[in-house]
């Protein structure tokens, strides 16, 4: 998706330089203004096409990009902003797919081993020039610990796109989503595409169950609440294992009763999306099957009624 014509990249790169050419000519030699306008239009057109978004991802090889910013969210969660080659660069990542991060991880015997993990960005192509990743560090997570140890200015190896799911408008009547922890990232991408990319006649409904341990663990809550307020076709239902006093949302693990209460019933035009810790996803596959949804495969395919990222 291209940035809007009112974005800073066009203001600084096209409009201001063109205006300076015309104004400067009018001050120095008014008779030449018509020529300066023609020159400004020609240069502006050339610059406009130069600034058109350029996709940088390559699924066949890793590329190195610079870590531009690291924003600490909590003791084990951070947002990593990766700078792309130019202000007009975009990943070109299909909605619902992810990128791979690779690194050489030291081994106990002194050797190193390439480890690769997949992450879904929380930013989109409408924000050119960079990509944001939300990553939670785990004690046994090789790549998450590697990312946590990086300093701004160091490089990150990126490859992609990757994944079997690609969102298309009106692909189903109703999405039911269940996410746990950082499993919210692919859901956010799909929800944002539905809410902010609705065409006339698109009536896609979305219900999301988002499970976490405590209220403080709820990632991207402001973004989710803003999307729910923006579009009555999207509803989010929070579930906490250790809720605070006065909590009115769900409590404990996600149960069949919660799925029945908040998510759509099985139908050919309904799709359930799952993302979270493996034990959670495994349990949810069994729960959805027990409720009448088609049995989820070990490795999901786009056409599956229950799809696990």
UniProtKB/Swiss-Prot annotation:
One of its GO terms (molecular function) is transferase activity. The keyword Oxidoreductase applies. One of its GO terms (biological process) is protein histidyl modification to diphthamide. One of its GO terms (cellular component) is endoplasmic reticulum. The gene is CBR1. SUPFAM superfamilies: Ferredoxin reductase-like, C-terminal NADP-linked domain (SSF52343), Riboflavin synthase domain-like (SSF63380). This is NADH-cytochrome b5 reductase 1. Pfam families: FAD_binding_6, NAD_binding_1. The lineage of its organism: Eukaryota, Fungi, Dikarya, Ascomycota, Pezizomycotina. InterPro entries: CBR-like, Cbr1-like_FAD-bd_dom, FAD-bd_FR_type, Flavoprot_Pyr_Nucl_cyt_Rdtase, FNR_nucleotide-bd, OxRdtase_FAD/NAD-bd, Riboflavin_synthase-like_b-brl.
